[in-house]
Amino acid sequence: MSDSKEPRLQQLGLLEEEQLGGVGFRQTRGYKSLAGCLGHGPLVLQLLSFTLLAGLLVQVSKVPSSLSQGQSKQDAIYQNLTQLKVAVSELSEKSKQQEIYQELTRLKAAVGELPEKSKQQEIYQELTRLKAAVGELPEKSKLQEIYQELTRLKAAVGELPEKSKQQEIYQELSQLKAAVGDLPEKSKQQEIYQKLTQLKAAVDGLPDRSKQQEIYQELIQLKAAVERLCRPCPWEWTFFQGNCYFMSNSQRNWHNSITACQEVGAQLVVIKSAEEQNFLQLQSSRSNRFTWMGLSDLNHEGTWQWVDGSPLLPSFKQYWNKGEPNNIGEEDCAEFSGNGWNDDKCNLAKFWICKKSAASCSGDEERLLSPTPTTPNPPPE
């Protein structure tokens, strides 16, 4: 019986050595004794229980190693955080960050102010046109030539007589040209007109100072020659059917208008024909003015007569406006009004028309016009 137990114990011992050796245990003398004692219980159950116990011991022995690895990982993370903190601390100072932020804010505002797409298209087209215009500029040598020419012109202008003198010359030319248009002798008019045209062209060309002085003296001589020519009407008067008419540019009452005409050897207009009426009515309505004529009923209410004492002919009554004369509020003086005549108060200030006979010119007759004024003086203040 004892012989059979011994081989079995040896087998158990070998098996335990293999299993325990696989989990990292060394055989000891005590261990062998423990195996021998356990041989008295259910051998398989005891062997499994011990195997589980050995596995637990192995796992427990590995826990410190895992903890050590976790600690190493934490240390690595901490080191990385430390390095990041150092890197952040080395960033630009706060003022630099603020500057960048402000710049970004300005850029954002600028982008917000960009024009809408249609406006951008318009700007683009304008830039294209400008680019084309720049491309058409003359070459540098041409620009230099233009600049030199401008410099010469500027120097020439600096040598011109004062502006008031130029203005005086220009006004003289304008007056002479207008006067020539009223001259009776066509051949003489043509000659003087050509002279004036040439002189005007010369003045417009503005030659050197000595030439201007020569032209100015010639103008004075021409003016004197023109004034010696026979003219039917004075300056600023209008010729019509053998008479001269002056249309005033200021206003007076009816009585002062008579005086103004007498001062220049004329009278407040007296109308003698339908043609004359149409001519004067046209002059008045064209300027849209209320204008005195030499007609009133001051001597006898309702009896109209001219300033030369002649009565108003019945055929002329057709020229009164509808419902006129109505003598509302002592309206005793006649005026041109709209397309006809009207009676109004004689103390009102209105424009007026003077009339006198035109001068007679025959053959080569020349006479010096009267030096007395031919234009009525303005009314006293």
Swiss-Prot record:
Listed GO MF terms: D-mannose binding; metal ion binding
Segments on the Extracellular face: 59-381
Domain C-type lectin: start-end pairs: 240-355
Tissues where this protein is expressed: Expressed in lymph nodes.
Cytoplasmic side: 1-37
Family annotation (PROSITE patterns): C_TYPE_LECTIN_1 (PS00615), C_TYPE_LECTIN_2 (PS50041)
Residues that bind Ca(2+): E324, N326, I328, E331, N342, D343
Protein name: CD209 antigen
Organism of provenance: Chlorocebus aethiops (Green monkey)
